[in-house]
Regions:
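Enzymes that bind and transform nitrogen-containing heteroaromatic metabolites
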Residues: 1-195
Length: 195
């Protein structure tokens, strides 16, 4: 396994902590799976989390500068899989992305796979995104970013599709063709999904 952990470390980034559902199943992964989940937020977000979450949250920071991180002992990341560390950067309700990325690297996280398009955009604006990939699912679901966003499908009633064609035009344009499969519902209830 090239010295890497079996499970990647998950990082939830939130401006103020109010958008984190602490009853989500990601906070209920069996500790034997050794899945580590970290929350990154602002000082205001850390206050909200400590006041509103029933979970165990050791606080790492706060860090206003890279020098603050240099002088800190972050401790070992892959311990106590029942705890969800909160790494605090920035001031007020504004986390500091550059300080966060520096702290994550110091913690041993060399590569990050960012799922959220809005956070990828934020990293691009900061000049901090080296590469990106597009995850293209054949499940017609989603919210305002998907076709038919005004009346999106739920996780139990979405149509599926099969790839028919995947093509490329020069080096910067991909096109696809899909065959819709209707009536494929309730294949997997994602609300019960466990890691």
């Amino acid at each position: 396994m090239l010295g890497k952990k079996y499970q990647p470390c998950g990082v939830i980034v939130s401006l103020d902590g109010t958008d984190i559902p602490f009853d989500h199943y990601i906070f209920d992964v069996d500790p034997k799976e050794e899945y580590k989940l970290v929350i990154a937020t602002s000082p205001g977000g850390a206050e909200y989390i400590m006041a509103n979450s029933p979970l165990k949250h050791p606080v790492i920071g706060p860090f206003k500068t890279i020098e603050d991180v240099d002088h800190a002992d972050l401790g070992e990341l892959y311990t106590d899989f029942n705890a969800f560390p909160v790494i605090v950067t920035g001031q007020g309700e504004n986390p500091d992305t550059k300080v966060l990325m520096y702290a994550l690297k110091k913690w041993g996280l060399e590569k990050l796979c960012i799922e959220a398009p809005s956070y990828c955009t934020h990293l691009l604006q900061q000049g901090m995104l080296d590469e990106y990939f597009i995850n293209y699912s054949m499940v017609f679901a989603g919210g305002q970013k998907s076709p038919g966003y005004a009346s999106e499908f739920g996780h139990m009633d979405h149509p599926h599709a099969d790839f028919l064609t995947l093509g490329i035009h020069e080096s910067n344009f991909i096109f696809t063709r899909q065959k819709i499969r209707y009536g494929v519902t309730n294949e997997t209830d994602l609300s019960g999904y466990k890691y």
